[in-house]
């Protein structure tokens, strides 16, 4: 089906800005927490005196990063299951609290093992990335809004990746450095900072997290179809604040409507009870009843005060209940051709159309984490020169490449932070234009082709380190490489999330998102381990291009897999989503009515007792 081109005004019509802003405040705080560690982790591990020498510090720093990713593999799927059973909002708040606790433990750690526990807890106690993806999909229900809504994820990560390193870099006050504690700090704060030099950045990041937690508690609406009508005391407090402080009239909540409707119907229900009681007085109360009640109805009847007769109780339940027998449903459990239950997550992930988007996402996560981790390492290697002629490079074009270009951390940090700002520009200004004119599969397939080219280019920056070549050539060359990566990442990340979202059944969408996060985390755990070995081997054998070219080949697998992803039919997707939503709403309404009539029965019994 041809993609209908929309104007910006048409695409923004009805866009759920308010709820998306609340979710964005939560999402923005999390990459700050994740990236604030990078500037000082080397010095923190070194100060723990766990490494036998400075050369081994990076290995122990890698353990901290790997423990986080490994624990995400373990926990993300279970957080998705938790959100399906208890709702998205409670899962989000638990994740924010868990991250805050783990950051405080990290900041006040006295040894390496405490820091390792803190990083592990950060991975275990937070599955918010997958839950936030689900929330965004349930907030942006119209196809024209989804791509722009999902694009907020990489945008906020880019912003957080700029702010986080600034906090971690400027708020660490270590002895023997130029970064000293400001004179205006209170005396007790100075004592704490001197004892725990890495605590302050973590405390500041916790403030960001608490701000996001407060906003989520007060203003975020539950998006799970089965729980969105459940009473939310946090929202009620938020509505009170909006009305009495900001003068904004909040909308009526579903549970407020239900309570009012119940109170209006009490009078009619009293009349029905009296009518049933009058009819029943003419019959023998010991006579057998027609055996048409199911177990749930029987349980409801038995829970009613004996002041109401059994026949009166049956009349009320039949009048107000939408409950239907479900024995047939439980007896008929479909089994897929793969031998798994059709409702199982294994079936949905590995034997349905969502498999290909998830597999592509795994490859993307792996090669991007390898790039992010090892590009600074490669640039930091000393420039290898010919022992016989120091003015010449030891590398020989095109196959013999050794060493790096001797970049300092400040140079690498400037390079990465600048391209991060460029990524924000891409998401804000370029992404909406691209999304309005092309479908997500076309965008994704086109941009994925650029990754292999970029990785092939990386090792050849060594040959620009020549006296006859101006130094700005190297800067431009590196900005081209990092710019391509940032441009492609900013535009492909929301597309693959959208493809996974729209390929997932609504009934287990949050669980699939949780499984996706676990699979991506496993990629971030495996990638650095494997390519760390490859990079070490290639440097020792003067073939540094092998590590980057192998990464390029791995990207081509993602390109191949992308052609197996089924295109999204916008009309079919919207109809399917609406139908599934209606099914959830129908179940929720049925449950609400059953609870309402049971509450009414209890009230009627109490009224009869008092009379």
From Swiss-Prot:
Membrane-related topology note: Multi-pass membrane protein
Cytoplasmic-side segments: 111-152, 221-353, 435-442, 564-611
Record-annotated membrane-spanning stretches: 90-110, 153-173, 200-220, 354-372, 414-434, 443-463, 543-563
InterPro entries: MFS, MFS_dom, MFS_trans_sf
Residues on Extracellular side: 1-89, 174-199, 373-413, 464-542
Gene3D superfamilies reported in the protein's UniProt record: MFS general substrate transporter like domains
Catalytic activities: chloride(in) = chloride(out)
Biased composition (Basic and acidic residues): 261-271
Superkingdom, natural source: Eukaryota
SUPFAM superfamilies: MFS general substrate transporter (SSF103473)
Single Gene Ontology MF annotation: chloride channel activity
PANTHER family: MAJOR FACILITATOR SUPERFAMILY (MFS) PROFILE DOMAIN-CONTAINING PROTEIN, MAJOR FACILITATOR SUPERFAMILY DOMAIN-CONTAINING PROTEIN 10
Entry's Gene Ontology cellular component terms: chloride channel complex; fungal-type vacuole membrane
Main localization category: membrane
Protein's name according to its UniProt entry: Major facilitator superfamily domain-containing protein YCR023C
Organism this protein belongs to: Saccharomyces cerevisiae (strain ATCC 204508 / S288c) (Baker's yeast)
